[in-house]
Amino acid sequence: MKHIRNFSIIAHIDHGKSTLSDRLIQVCGGLSDREMAAQVLDSMDLERERGITIKAQSVTLDYHAKDGNTYQLNFIDTPGHVDFSYEVSRSLAACEGALLVVDAGQGVEAQTLANCYTALEMNLDVVPVLNKIDLPQAEPERVALEIEDIVGIEAINAVRCSAKTGIGVEDVLEEIVAKIPPPVGDETAPLQALIIDSWFDAYLGVVSLVRIKHGVLKKGEKFKVMSTGQNYNADRVGIFTPKEKDKLELRAGEVGYVISGIKEIHGAPVGDTLTHAKHGADKPLPGFKKVKPQVYAGVFPISTDEYENFRDALNKLSLNDASLFFEPETSSALGFGFRIGYLGLLHMEIVQERLEREYNLDLITTAPTVVYEVVMTNGDIVYVDNPSDLPALNNIDEIHEPIVEANILVPKEYLGNVITLCIEKRGSQTNMVYHGNQVAVTYHLPMAEVVMDFFDRLKSTSRGYASLEYNFIRFDPADMVRLDILINGDRVDALAMIIHRSNIRHRGLALVEKMKELIPRQMFDIAIQAAVGSQIIARSTIKALRKDVTAKCYGGDVSRKKKLLNKQKEGKKRMKQVGNVEVPQEAFLAVLKLND
């Protein structure tokens, strides 16, 4: 066991985690040169296209160190984006150490900090690595000082490497062997294995990635899942090198996969413990804290007969994505669908894209909302994540909105722009620290503002240099109201949104104008109104198409024309009573794209 090293790679987006993992695989000969592709571990098409890591992946490599021993390195490549921080904490639970990769040109960014603190809280040894030293703008000395200053770990002697050209990769491997401690565990104790991740394979059933803490898991043995008490047979066990490689057993300290033909989707939940069916361990390992979704949106299949497939797809996806939450929902405008809870907007985009690609579904999403705490006049507290569930205004005592603490790292020259943006988003500043050229500012912001388009706006006001990391801290009372859109006097539930009273006039007008462009003209007038309670705050009318009924009259008495026009008017009136307006797909999406 003393020759095993378990570690994960943490870094900010685009600091070169996936490229570094490619190099480690290549140096240790995990794949032949022919099989090497850039970003081997980003196996989803979506990951490659966007150039981001979404799912953590594990690999086992053998490294012949300079001290003459062969070490087994198990490493897990983790995502860097703030929406996927739960993936990072899951990966870290399986490790004894972490490589903190920092771009020698850009320096420390907010996400580097957040992930690094997560690792230090779990008592992992953090080894700093300065990447991209081949770039002309690299300043390893300055960045090393920045790491010591901001993160607070010793970094003057940090390894310098360039994952792209391969300089210094051997030194990184030597550092891992020297600085990261071997796993602690007892091979003779009863089996305890932590499920780090699982996914559904059409042929094999559920495949689980496990870290063996104590004991040995042999091929063909019976094991049980501790939370459900169900017993299964370990048909295949093995490791990823990144290819699957079957083994006869997995020993304490190792990371590998178990395939046991589990067909039901939630047979082996992530964070659960496996043990032997006979003479098993008494208590499970501490799992992961369940993450609470921050953003909710209604998602509906475009054709209603897809509903069953949609449900199956969500079940399969939630196995692989432990943070996904969903419950059935119906809407008078869109039919049957689900209310899905996400960790943030990027997560929402990725989930929708994965559903559409991997399961061939056509979906439509309503505007995302956060969870509000509503105090009723009778003293009850209810949590509302859907605007149409908001109780009537006269029953509400006050509404509390979720507040996040946002840590923003930004170069000095863009500080003014960032502060202006935060004030516009109703933020209050709580802290500001200068670290050399970087400034760390902390703001308390309403989550609803952060979720909509804050990240994009932050990047554009700072030319992409600012970085953001946020977490929920509390609920604060706020003057929130529900903005309804009425079409010919009928509420369209899928277009409702909860917003701050100061924004309603501006938001209402913009929405009504947008709807006017998108709803096709009918044979009768369509009134589009934005309302708060019973008060109408904006209105626009789509004029009716009309046929020129008097075209056949020429000359003669005006009363003949009047008669025809009045007859047309009567017809339009009747039509308006029975006619209903189809709201096109684009109208629902317009709500999402409505920038302030």
Curated annotation (Swiss-Prot):
<protein>
    <recommendedName>
        <fullName>Elongation factor 4</fullName>
        <ecNumber>3.6.5.n1</ecNumber>
    </recommendedName>
</protein>
<dbReference type="InterPro" id="IPR038363">
    <property type="entry name" value="LepA_C_sf"/>
</dbReference>
<dbReference type="GO" id="GO:0097216">
    <property type="term" value="F:guanosine tetraphosphate binding"/>
</dbReference>
<feature type="domain" description="tr-type G">
    <location>
        <begin position="2"/>
        <end position="184"/>
    </location>
</feature>
<dbReference type="Pfam" id="PF00009">
    <property type="entry name" value="GTP_EFTU"/>
</dbReference>
<feature type="binding site">
    <location>
        <begin position="131"/>
        <end position="134"/>
    </location>
    <ligand>
        <name>GTP</name>
    </ligand>
</feature>
<dbReference type="Pfam" id="PF06421">
    <property type="entry name" value="LepA_C"/>
</dbReference>
<feature type="binding site">
    <location>
        <begin position="14"/>
        <end position="19"/>
    </location>
    <ligand>
        <name>GTP</name>
    </ligand>
</feature>
<dbReference type="InterPro" id="IPR004161">
    <property type="entry name" value="EFTu-like_2"/>
</dbReference>
<dbReference type="InterPro" id="IPR031157">
    <property type="entry name" value="G_TR_CS"/>
</dbReference>
<dbReference type="GO" id="GO:0005525">
    <property type="term" value="F:GTP binding"/>
</dbReference>
<dbReference type="GO" id="GO:0005886">
    <property type="term" value="C:plasma membrane"/>
</dbReference>
<dbReference type="Pfam" id="PF00679">
    <property type="entry name" value="EFG_C"/>
</dbReference>
<comment type="similarity">
    <text>Belongs to the TRAFAC class translation factor GTPase superfamily. Classic translation factor GTPase family. LepA subfamily.</text>
</comment>
<keyword id="KW-0997">Cell inner membrane</keyword>
<dbReference type="InterPro" id="IPR035654">
    <property type="entry name" value="LepA_IV"/>
</dbReference>
<keyword id="KW-0378">Hydrolase</keyword>
<keyword id="KW-0472">Membrane</keyword>
<dbReference type="InterPro" id="IPR035647">
    <property type="entry name" value="EFG_III/V"/>
</dbReference>
<dbReference type="InterPro" id="IPR005225">
    <property type="entry name" value="Small_GTP-bd"/>
</dbReference>
<comment type="function">
    <text>Required for accurate and efficient protein synthesis under certain stress conditions. May act as a fidelity factor of the translation reaction, by catalyzing a one-codon backward translocation of tRNAs on improperly translocated ribosomes. Back-translocation proceeds from a post-translocation (POST) complex to a pre-translocation (PRE) complex, thus giving elongation factor G a second chance to translocate the tRNAs correctly. Binds to ribosomes in a GTP-dependent manner.</text>
</comment>
<dbReference type="GO" id="GO:0003924">
    <property type="term" value="F:GTPase activity"/>
</dbReference>
<dbReference type="InterPro" id="IPR013842">
    <property type="entry name" value="LepA_CTD"/>
</dbReference>
<dbReference type="InterPro" id="IPR006297">
    <property type="entry name" value="EF-4"/>
</dbReference>
<keyword id="KW-0547">Nucleotide-binding</keyword>
<dbReference type="InterPro" id="IPR000640">
    <property type="entry name" value="EFG_V-like"/>
</dbReference>
<dbReference type="InterPro" id="IPR000795">
    <property type="entry name" value="T_Tr_GTP-bd_dom"/>
</dbReference>
<keyword id="KW-0648">Protein biosynthesis</keyword>
<keyword id="KW-1003">Cell membrane</keyword>
<dbReference type="GO" id="GO:0045727">
    <property type="term" value="P:positive regulation of translation"/>
</dbReference>
<dbReference type="GO" id="GO:0043022">
    <property type="term" value="F:ribosome binding"/>
</dbReference>
<dbReference type="InterPro" id="IPR027417">
    <property type="entry name" value="P-loop_NTPase"/>
</dbReference>
<dbReference type="Pfam" id="PF03144">
    <property type="entry name" value="GTP_EFTU_D2"/>
</dbReference>
<dbReference type="GO" id="GO:0003746">
    <property type="term" value="F:translation elongation factor activity"/>
</dbReference>
<keyword id="KW-0342">GTP-binding</keyword>
